[in-house]
Amino acid sequence: AEELVKPYNGDPFVGHLSTP
């Protein structure tokens, strides 16, 4: 939701923010 990181939750925008 901040910067483009690795798509953990399938979303590149919620990468490091939405870790499973």
UniProtKB/Swiss-Prot annotation:
Source organism phylogeny: Bacteria, Bacillati, Cyanobacteriota, Cyanophyceae, Thermostichales
Cellular compartment(s): Cellular thylakoid membrane
Name of the gene encoding the protein in the UniProt record: psaL
Main location: membrane
Highest taxon of the lineage: Bacteria
The keyword Transmembrane appears for this protein: yes
Record bears the keyword Protein transport: no
Record membrane topology: Multi-pass membrane protein
Protein name: Photosystem I reaction center subunit XI
Annotated keywords: Membrane, Photosynthesis, Photosystem I, Thylakoid, Transmembrane
Annotated signal peptide: none
A cellular component annotation (GO) from this entry: plasma membrane-derived thylakoid membrane
Biological process per Gene Ontology, one example term: photosynthesis
Region described as Disordered: 1-20
Family of this protein: Belongs to the PsaL family.
